[in-house]
Amino acid sequence: MSKKVLVTRTPLGARRRALLGGAALLAGSTLPGWARAAADAAAQAGSGQAADAAGASAGSAAVSGSAASPAAPAVVGTKKVPRLLLAGPFATVSNPLIRIVDAGLLADVAEKVEFVSWRTPDQLRAMALKGEADFLAMPSNLSANLYNRGLKLQQMNIGIWGILWMVARRDGLKTLADFKGQEVVMPFRGDMPDALFRLLCRKQDIDPDKDMTLRYVASPLDAMQLLITRRADNALLADPAVAVGLRKSQSFPISVVAPSLYRSVSLQEEWGRVFNRAPRMPQAGIVMLGSQLGNTALARRFEEACEEAQNWCEANPDECGQIVARRIEMLTPEGVADAIRADKSDMVVASKARSELEFFYQQLLEMQPGLVGGKLPDDGFYFAG
């Protein structure tokens, strides 16, 4: 087949969001687009203005939170930390952070614990580079990238091992090879999901630029709109955008015109099959940074609370959906719960996940070195627990 790459034109506002989504976080690096997927999918339900307002509010809260000079780390056991700020995207990786705040799991070590959500690369960059958050959820390649470029942080854990899915109008598609000769809609060209899709295709002797028609769009919202309005048959998306979108396509009045949509190929399952490994990828986790970095007692206490919170979320998806949706208006309780049930989540301390992280990073280095900052992180990157 001849090479076919289509780029869908979108309105100015959508193109501006796409430019933000693909903008360099630091020289040579980009921000993976899955972190904004849930907000984009929810906007499909008519919450676009609420999403913009919430994103702006979160960014304002994050930036204003570090106006004062950072205080010296408090010693857990003798004095409570005055304030801890936890931050994450509109995605599953933030669930345990929200549970920690909602249940007061760190009340014994901090006077005040707050959660804020980040939506744009500018917000994440400000929070990370200025050390405004104490614990920050982000994609695992991005934390390696920032660390390799000199930012002081430590990877605490990996909690997300599988959120990328092919969504298709046709049932029965089991592997990426089944998409040969078909069009695949892809948000965020050159970003992490795109890179992983290409990597997994090429490991199976599939040239995605020749054997498929790749149609790049500005955001997951655009991809889901194309599916729901029958203008596309297949798309690569991430949870909870997948779950929210599938729920929306089955609800009135959209269900009147929307086709049946299916979770098709799990990229995590493809990863395991192609590399003969466990079917999971260390996609996202939580880092420690800011004024409390180096407070080992606090780090250990946080890790205990994070594991407890993650276990609760996995055991109580419906209740977790309720508390997450209360704090992130763009998500629905049902969509959050569906995503928890569908995806692979397992809280693993960074040092214990190191071998899987390094294998993951090595594949990205060979594919697109800038995604991880050009090298493997050293020992100081991994929290030992």
Each predicted region: which residue ranges?
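N-terminal secretory signal peptides
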Residues: 1-14, 24-29
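C-terminal segment of N-terminal export signals and the immediately downstream linker at the start
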Residues: 11-12, 33-83
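Short, glycine-/small- and polar/acidic-enriched structural segments
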Residues: 63-65, 69-217, 233-239, 256-265
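Structured segments of extracytoplasmic/periplasmic soluble domains
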Residues: 100-103, 127, 145, 182, ...
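Short, solvent-exposed loop/beta-turn-alpha elements that line the ligand-binding surface or hinge
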Residues: 108-109, 271-276, 346-353
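Pocket-lining segment of extracytoplasmic ligand-binding domains
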Residues: 141-142, 221-323
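Secondary-structure end/capping motifs
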Residues: 291-367
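Conserved C-terminal helix/tail region of periplasmic/extracytoplasmic solute-binding proteins
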Residues: 358, 362-385
